[in-house]
UniProtKB/Swiss-Prot annotation:
Catalytic center residues: 104 (nucleophile), 108 (proton donor)
Localization annotation: Secreted, Cell wall; Secreted, Extracellular space, Apoplast
Protein name, UniProt field: Xyloglucan endotransglucosylase/hydrolase protein 14
InterPro entries: Beta-glucanase/XTH, ConA-like_dom_sf, GH16, GH16_AS, XET_C, XTH
Residues of the site described as Important for catalytic activity: 106
Amino acid sequence: MACFATKQPLLLSLLLAIGFFVVAASAGNFYESFDITWGNGRANIFENGQLLTCTLDKVSGSGFQSKKEYLFGKIDMKLKLVAGNSAGTVTAYYLSSKGTAWDEIDFEFLGNRTGHPYTIHTNVFTGGKGDREMQFRLWFDPTADFHTYTVHWNPVNIIFLVDGIPIRVFKNNEKNGVAYPKNQPMRIYSSLWEADDWATEGGRVKIDWSNAPFKASYRNFNDQSSCSRTSSSKWVTCEPNSNSWMWTTLNPAQYGKMMWVQRDFMIYNYCTDFKRFPQGLPKECKL
């Protein structure tokens, strides 16, 4: 990735506006980094904090959230998705702020029947408004092993990556009147839940509870390239080498890989859905 240090004055103004200090961020284990928030025992941490699992049965799903809030960062998580007949299930992994005008950056993994591919559903919300969906298939089986899903969020762009391969970029086009998430710290959330009214083939394929409990697994959480704060902190802290990721965009090789993914594996792009937007596509689609 290329680094644009010439934008440091803008970075400084952003940091001072929120209240940043520059200190080292660290990748913690799941005990240190997350709280299990719901599921009544259906989410659990194992291996001295190195493995977390969420399960779903007919009574309830489960979920967890980060102890810290983030304002920009490169956040990695390895996931192994629900195997077998996962139709009607959703594994969500996203960042979100609070309030009615929230910001949000989404990965959602929509289950499918045995032998049929998962759908990766991505979205970006700004000020409580989303409608920026892009959906993809994967070029591997996401249930056979762990794979890395990354949100790289900085003042320039939001990059969605799978195993280091970019699949989508949402650029900061505020100068052209497009809102961009840059002022509201967000927590990381993840959950496994039932959504068979829409998740698989628009809700035509329902969940088969005879396959329960369904399980998604997590490893290797890494937030070492980030700016964050705890609930008890007023200030957001950045790791000292923040300039290595704070202004990065795709280099030509990475852009080429993203074009490969979007050509061969994208199945929905809101920027080409003219029926959905009869009054005209969203502004960022034309830039």
